[in-house]
Amino acid sequence: MTLQKYRLRTKSLHILNHHQNGTTLIEIIIVIGIVAILVALATPFIQSWRQNFEANNLFQKISPALKQARSSAALRNVAVSICGGTSTSCTGLWRDGMLTFIDINHNGTIDSATDHIIAHTPLELSYGVLIWRGAGGRAHIIYQENGLPLGSNGSLRYCGQEQKYHRSVVLSMMGHTRRSPDRNLDGIYEDTNGRPFIC
């Protein structure tokens, strides 16, 4: 084979290989269409999974905050309150987080002269709201100097977008916490009376 024929043959093979490596516009459109269909099918599942995760994970955030407040009250021999609020003040909005603070006069607000903040537990809720329903009609939880709730037994209710995402953290008269059960395993959690709770 002569050198000129070899160069010509190599050049034609190079051109042939170059065209085989590319993708056509039709192939790109098909791939984009398939990806769009998969995303459309997966989005409801992902959102449902995230809502369920938020509802189930809430107990792991709330229970330690309540236990810390209870032990702080007993160890320091002072009243400790928990309210819904930011890291610096009680707003009454539990979605902002749980603010734990020493509450000398049991009024549920931070008095700068006597009270100080112990901790703030951010909740970062995206799919539901958190509501405190307690005895005595208070908007906050108070642990007395002995570590027992002061008329504050009740529940922190998480109200999701659908009833299957509703959850509750129950605070007993002794200051213990437990999560709401699903006794009949129907996917709907019940209140302390065994009825599905409604937000």
Model regions: which residues?
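N-terminal helix-rich module
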Residues: 2-14, 41-67, 71, 75, ...
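Alpha-helical hydrophobic helix detector
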Residues: 29-45
